[in-house]
Amino acid sequence: MDTLDELYFKMLKKAVDGELELAPEGMDPRLIDCLTLPNDGTVVRVKPCLCPPDERHCAAACEWDALKPGNEVGIAVDTEKCVGCQACIDACELDSLKAKKDIIPVVQELHQYDGPVYALVAPAIAGQFGADVTMGKMRSTLKALGFTGMLEVAAFADILTLKEALEFDKNINSEGDFQLTSCCCPMWIAMIKKLYHQLLPNVPGSVSPMIAGGRTVKALHPKAKTVFIGPCLAKKAEKNEPDIAGAIDYVLTYQELRDLLSVTDLKPADMPEDAQPHASTTGITYAYAGGVAAAVKRTLEKLNPHRKIKLQTRKADGVPGCKAMINDILEGRRDGNFFEGMGCIGGCVGGPRAIIPKEEGKKCVQTYADSSAFETPMENPYVIGMLKELGFNTVEDFLTKSHLYDRQF
């Protein structure tokens, strides 16, 4: 019988070829579900767990108490608690836990759906498919795969930067006030919601750039399907959270996109340029730790250069680092008023489904960010024009009418 990886590539090739019957007869239904049911959890057990109860390293590695003894042999994953961080997958010594893949259903949509299908790529994509693969070449590649178009999520990071800068300017009025970000990291938000909920009043009610992108596309193109592409497994769980579900239909990782390219004849480096730059420097730098805080700080300086209480940033990356920073906040050792947390070491460039090392990824993102003609969203005509198309004609409108990008924690 095929292993999960063997089955995956066989089914992916059939999907690319347009075949309707993808799964061979007699395969374990858990393997089929892992490859074809993207909305039913993020981590699945594909074979029995034979570890003694006191040696279940997966459960010990889970920060969210999402792994429990199952009715069958082994472990059950609580999809309500799981945030898709991958810690349990890495800790499983029997290779029994796997992450779900969305790529096969996406390929089927590209063949069969009669409406537009948009790819929304996270800014950490810079360099992931080769140093010579520009954003324009990646756009051509995705269109050749069947996508209607490609949008940079960094543009929606620009929108959230503006929103968070406005909220900081409105809400931080004394030396004791402080604000927590980053809305872009589902692990950071999950940590606050599940473990440190007393800090929720200090979290701006903003969706992530991924959700902002999906909502914007669907506001402008109601029949569109949206596919996020990034280095993060936790985004697969985020898209299914009840209060924001529906904005993003599928989440692919860079590794899934690489797998798709491996069964086609497409080579991104050889594709023609289709350059449509629409993100600022600060939006692109969301991809690495410290980028969000720096973006909001620089934008606030342009919004209100004479502000008495300046934005003072502090950042942490990795779950232990984020926990340490939160404990400092709770114990009064703040050393700042704007706190950024990223669940992965290095930020998104260090995500579990990145293709290149995080240090190389950061350099590629910095190079791409430096090439932008716009430093912040304040100068970005693409973002300003999009906001006007959505009905935001002034800065004040965006502060008071930004329901499209709001989230209630």
Predicted regions and their residues:
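Generic low-polarity alpha-helical segments
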Residues: 1, 47, 55-58, 75, ...
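Iron-sulfur cluster-binding cysteine motifs and their immediate structural context
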Residues: 52-78, 83, 87-103, 355
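Iron-sulfur-associated redox domains of electron-transfer enzymes in respiratory
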Residues: 2-15, 19-27, 100-409
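N-terminal-biased segments
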Residues: 13-22, 33-48, 86-102
